[in-house]
Amino acid sequence: MADNGCLFCKIASGQIPCNKIYEDQDVIAFLDINPASKGHTLVVTKEHFQDFAKTPRDVIGHVYSVAQLISQACIKELKATGVNVITNAGKSAGQSVLHFHVHVIPRYDGDGIGIPFEPSVPLIGSEQLPLLANSIKKGIE
């Protein structure tokens, strides 16, 4: 089901044009209009899911399969020397369009692009790691 106000739903339905790389019945992939690098592509579900945590696993698997195809094409055709495959889930994680999508960002030697993951909390002591692991496990069970 589409969200009428969603930018990516409008692109997926053809209401807004894009530079399409790939499309099937469930997914569309297109060049990012504000690319981090040459070939930066977004892989977007056609059905509206707000973010990674709210998207069915089979859909996530398909999106990442398409992301892998695009990664391979960027390495082969654009001579990328690496690829970042990134999902931002939620506004606090940097998700600017609240529709599940994956960034495929081709990387090139010396491109100067950084992934700024600086620790924002004190490092956790090794004695606290089992407690943290158990907290997360509880949410899975």
Spell out what each predicted region is:
Residues M1-E141:
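HIT superfamily nucleotide-processing domains
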